[in-house]
Amino acid sequence: MFIIGQRWISESENNLGLGIVTARDNRTVTIRFPAAEEERIYALAVAPLIRVQFQKGDRINCIDGWQLDVEDVLDNQGFVIYLGSRVDNGEQVALPEMQLDHKVSFSKPQDRLFSAQIDRSDRFALRYRALQHQQAQFQSPLRAMRGIRASLIPHQLHIAKEVGQRVAPRVLLADEVGLGKTIEAGMILQQQLFSGRVERVLVLVPESLQHQWLVEMLRRFNLNFSLFDEERCSDFDKTDEDGNDISENPFESEALVIASIDWLEKATTRATQVLLADWDLLIVDEAHHLVCSATESSQAYQFVARLAKKITAVLLLTATPEQLGLDSHFARLALLDPDRFYDYATFIAEQKAYKPVADAVANLLNDKPLNDMAKNAIAELLSEQDTEPMFKIINSEKSAESDRLQVRQELINALIDRHGTSRVLFRNTRQGVKGFPHRVYHQITLEMPDQYANALNVRAMMGSMEPQDHFYPERLYQCLNSQAPMGNRWEDFDPRIAWLMTFLKNHRDEKVLIICKQAEIAITLAQVLREREAIRTAVFHEHMTIVERDRAAAYFAQIEEGAQVLISSSIGSEGRNFQFARNLVLFNLPDNPDLLEQSIGRLDRIGQKNDIQIYVPCFKNSMQIVLAEWYHRGLNAFEETCPMGSNLFAEFSETLQSFFNDPQATGFEEFIAKTSKRRQQLKMELEQGRDRLLELNSNGGETAQALAEAIAQEDNNPHLVNFALNLFDIIGLEQEDLGEKLIALNPTGHMLVSDFPGLSEEGTTITFDRQLALMREEIELLTWDHPMIRHGIDLITSGDIGKCAISLLINKNLPAGTLLLEAIYVVEAQAPKSLNLTRFLPPTPVRVLLDSKGNDMASQVAFTSLEKQLKPVNKQMANKIAKMAQTQIKKLIMLSEQKIETKAQAIIIAAKQQADNVLSAELHRLTSLQAVNKNIRADEIELLEHLKAESLAQLTQANWRLDSLRVIVSNKA
């Protein structure tokens, strides 16, 4: 019966919103849909309409914008009035149904079922699987570590896991060059973000590394950082009509920020704004530039010190922690833990005291007997343990090798836990990490063209000569001869180009990376190689967008039809690694050792399978050859990493400059010998200062190896592949198998959502193969941690997709018309993300399968086997079933609520027990270690105590809700 003013919805056109009866006669009813500004006239006998009536406990929207919590429902001659209290002010009001908001949405599965918003059965299945996978991923110990687009390097994974799971980590990451500090920092950051402990992040880097960090964070971790500079910040500077400053703090506009510490040193207003903004995590790269001694500290150090006081989590990165002296090293440790590192003299004394322990550890590692000095050093550090029986086993020739191995490992583990800086400082060295190739240097000495010599003479006569002119004569010539005719341009006579083309023809089957100083040189070189020798060439420079660089990198990476050569400007290649190539040509020699190492580091990474061949073409009697000789014979910087390179560069810069001014001056050989001797001296000091105990703690050993293997086993996981493809199919993405383990995803016009996370308008190419993704940077590597999967799961579980469905069960053993109810409940704790309770109690789906008598058959009938027997029902038939069986379905829903309580309570109790066990064990370990290791911060223990108390309290309040349901009706065929 239709009454004017009643609210109805259309079964076939849910998108019209909530309709209102405006007229009726003996044969028809007229419904107006204000939200869609549409009107429909239906025949009374077959009107596809459903009456909308809310129930006690529902929250409904008024047309005026406020909400009402329904406490009672009155029926006034077929017209409904809702009684309850307003959400905004608590006022008790009556709301006639005519005043309901025209845009209605039903979120409860039972409401959707009875309002003709029934979904397909395969979407219900996808929703349940999404909930299952979400639960599994929240509890996975590999979460936030397997999604990185990088090789699985054990020591990196170990540091990331050890630090990333801490509450408010404050550490110094000091791995040597090429061992992946940026990756370690990114994985630590990823874990902190995933756990909810961190939301706002500030990364401070030298200006030259800004783009490298931006690219690394995006390409390796799918983290969209924003680069802040003066131009960006000035957009937030505002004044009102009276000239009063009403500027906003630009650093509050983004959550993930990268800024140059060099810029902030000069821009005091911006530095103040950084300090005024709230941050959860601070990352500082190249932290050895933070100089501090007993008498003075740099401006950069003071600025970072102020930030470190107010930001709870801090990561400092440096490849050379003691490069500028132990006092600066101590000062950086004091930034991290001022209570622990309060006195420099005490710190020095402690460092000396650990020397005998480090020597003892070396003996333990080499399975050598321990002398009295070593035993005394170990016994003093492990004073709470009786170590004598262990020493006897180690020193006795009669001891079984397995016993000695076990005791040695126990001692090493105990010493690591008590090591002076092992919780604050992590350092791996190339000696301690295997897998690096050799570097082979080839110096190509060429005659300087007369054109360059003349250009240099002209510049000298003009009195405006600069060192850059000697290092990059092609730029000088181009500047002086900008209108040079064809055949007389620099690329027409430079002998480096002739050598390069011959070299490339002789190495046709090998990839070659060429690094130039400037983008213009790279572009010109590429054009010459293409036009003269048809050499397939890609270009990489700072004026290209990230997408353009991706395409160039992909072209270079292709094996069959890819580019033989990638020509890059020195800035353009920052953050990009090309381990699949082994030939490096430095067309322009970098003008300082750090830049040289950065260039070689594009190929010299963990994962490089071949020896790296480094070619440097340079001119006789030039600055270039002086610098090349000094790099090679003085620093040995081409064939070995030179961590002391910048120190030596600063120490010998004046003498080096004198030879730049006169490359043929006498005494150069003595200068080379002096540099080499000093390098050997510094290298020996570094080697003697190696802390094997620290390296052991940083390396992770067998545990780290097992972690890498566990992640490798998850790569190409069939559950992930099947779920992802099913997700993309149901969402409505077009999928094209490209072969070679590649799938192209493209948006379509019939997608369930207009904007799928991670999918660009042009489409996205994906793979589940890590090695392929490492070679092809334009391809997305899909893992459980990838945004397309994580946000795809969120899209399904937090929306209405698959919330209710109706299916036919083809089973000859059941009477036709038998009704079953499959209800999916979710047990969860509504708590602050920072508690990271999802590791103990993630949103957990619990399945209840009731027969018509109310018996729960979930344990007897598996979801997958039932799914195979189900057939879809068209929408019209589904609506009829929902109407006809409404009373029975409601009864079964009430029964399911009784069944779920016992199951849910058991899950909550188990989660509380797990949380108590894990947090108590962690607390006990830290408390015990604090007695013997001063590096355990008191605030770290206090935070953990608070975390435990709050976690258990929140888990006590955990609850459950009906997430989705499926009505199943049996049929014979």
From Swiss-Prot:
InterPro entries: Helicase_ATP-bd, Helicase_C-like, Helicase_RapA, P-loop_NTPase, RapA_C, SNF2-like_sf, SNF2/RAD54-like_C, SNF2_N. GO terms for molecular function: ATP binding; DNA binding; helicase activity; hydrolase activity, acting on acid anhydrides. Residues 162-339 form the Helicase ATP-binding domain. GO terms for biological process: regulation of DNA-templated transcription. Residues 496-672 form the Helicase C-terminal domain. A motif (DEAH box) lies at residues 285-288. CDD domains: DEXDc_RapA (cd18011), SF2_C_SNF (cd18793). It comes from the Bacteria. Its EC number is 3.6.4.-. It holds the Pfam family RapA_C. Gene3D superfamilies: 2.30.30.140, 2.30.30.930, 3.30.360.80, 6.10.140.1500, 6.10.140.2230, P-loop containing nucleotide triphosphate hydrolases (3.40.50.300), Tandem AAA-ATPase domain (3.40.50.10810). Keywords: Activator, ATP-binding, DNA-binding, Helicase, Hydrolase, Nucleotide-binding, Transcription, Transcription regulation. ATP binds at D175, E176, V177, G178, L179, G180, K181, T182. It is an enzyme of class 3 (hydrolase). Belongs to the SNF2/RAD54 helicase family. RapA subfamily. Interacts with the RNAP. Has a higher affinity for the core RNAP than for the holoenzyme. Its ATPase activity is stimulated by binding to RNAP. Transcription regulator that activates transcription by stimulating RNA polymerase (RNAP) recycling in case of stress conditions such as supercoiled DNA or high salt concentrations. Probably acts by releasing the RNAP, when it is trapped or immobilized on tightly supercoiled DNA. Does not activate transcription on linear DNA. Probably not involved in DNA repair. This is RNA polymerase-associated protein RapA. The lineage of its organism: Bacteria, Pseudomonadati, Pseudomonadota, Gammaproteobacteria, Pasteurellales.
